[in-house]
UniProtKB/Swiss-Prot annotation:
Identification of the protein by name: Hydrogenase maturation factor HypB
Highest taxon of source: Bacteria
Binding-site positions, Ni(2+) 1: C2, C5, C7
Pfam families: cobW
Classification via InterPro entries: AAA+_ATPase (IPR003593), CobW/HypB/UreG_nucleotide-bd (IPR003495), Hyd_mat_HypB (IPR004392), P-loop_NTPase (IPR027417)
Swiss-Prot/TrEMBL keywords: GTP-binding, Hydrolase, Metal-binding, Nickel, Nucleotide-binding, Zinc
Phylogenetic lineage: Bacteria, Pseudomonadati, Pseudomonadota, Gammaproteobacteria, Pseudomonadales
CDD domains tied to this protein: HypB (cd05390)
Species of provenance: Azotobacter chroococcum mcd 1
Residues passing through the membrane, by range: none
GO molecular function: ATP hydrolysis activity; GTP binding; GTPase activity; nickel cation binding; zinc ion binding
Keyword Transmembrane attached: no
Family membership: Belongs to the SIMIBI class G3E GTPase family. HypB/HupM subfamily.
The keyword rRNA processing is annotated on this UniProt entry: no
């Protein structure tokens, strides 16, 4: 997992940005030449149940050859601590612009981009919209977004398997005129690493297609625990599949009892109205919370007069 080893330095490419050699992109990179081999007592506990091997049982909840559990925990704290500082900066910038930001996460092939383009079409031009698009390579998805008339900045992560808050902050610098608008961050297709990385978003939205299997929330619990909403996508295919919708929802709520679930299909239009209504409700709640905070600040200042 990326919180253990970090991602390849110098791989990130952001459209519209001049390349800066040696730019610190927000990840911690340890030098394997100086890693001490752990003593057996420090190694990741291995739990064996029949033919099942469980390596994620130690404090780090992961295993990396040559790294002790304590060292892995320290690396994770360093990486996520640095990322969280960038995320806080992003969140402050977004809030200053009254910009509502969603982080769309899923496995590859879940239909994120198709769902996003349909969402953009249905939202219309009532307020500013933009997309930050994450992929390891190519700008294919960003081109699809731009075809709708909405600006999109492509972030290529190279060997990196997720976006981090520093990448998003740099990509956001390429966008303008988003006051009071919506920003969608389409993360790299990956149900593991993006779960741990706050990008400064208001909500993580997990997209699970009915072609993937109903037990995905149990196999990748961190992602569904981190998400506030699960979009059960490609429901138009259900007549052709052996997919247990109720079991899938139950699994998601076993991991995260508070997760909201909406069944959607960009092709048939099922659930799209409910999805858009959820966006509007959450955006409104965010704005009202900010108004209340500003009023409280104003009252505190008035008390000083």
């Amino acid at each position: 997992m990326c919180t253990v080893c970090g991602c390849a330095e110098g791989e990130t490419r952001i459209e519209g940005e001049h390349h800066h050699h040696g730019y610190d992109h927000g990840h911690h990179h340890h030098d394997h030449a100086f890693v001490r081999r752990p003593a057996p007592a420090e190694a990741a506990p291995l739990v064996v149940e029949g033919l099942n091997l469980h390596f994620g049982q130690g404090p780090a909840r992961a295993h990396a050859p040559g790294l002790s559990q304590s060292r892995m925990v320290q690396i994770e704290q360093d990486i996520l601590g640095k990322n969280d500082r960038y995320a806080a900066e992003n969140r402050a910038r977004f809030e200053a612009l009254s910009l509502f930001v969603l982080n769309l996460v899923s496995s590859p092939g879940s239909g994120k981009t198709t769902l996003l383009t349909k969402t953009i079409e249905l939202l219309g031009r009532h307020r500013p919209l933009a997309v930050i698009e994450g992929d390891q390579q190519t700008d294919h998805d960003a081109a699809r977004i731009r075809a709708t008339g909405v600006p999109a900045v492509q972030v290529n992560t190279g060997k990196g398997c997720h976006l981090d808050a520093h990448m998003v902050g740099r990509a956001f610098e390429q966008l303008e005129g988003l006051d009071g608008g919506l920003l969608f961050i389409e993360n790299v297709g990956n149900l593991v690493c993006p779960a741990a990385f706050d990008l400064g978003e208001a909500h993580k939205v997990a997209i699970l297609s009915v072609t993937e299997g109903e037990d995905k929330p149990l196999k990748y619990p961190d992602m569904f625990h981190a998400a506030d909403l699960m979009l059960l996508n490609k429901t138009d295919l259900l007549p052709h599949l052996d997919f247990d919708v109720e079991a899938c929802i139950a699994y998601a709520r076993r991991v995260n009892p508070d997760i909201k679930v909406i069944r959607v299909s960009a092709r048939s239009g099922e659930g799209m109205g409910e999805w858009l209504a959820w966006i509007e409700r959450q955006r409104g709640a965010r704005l009202r919370a900010r108004i209340d905070a500003l009023r409280a600040q104003a009252q505190a200042l008035e008390a000083l007069l």
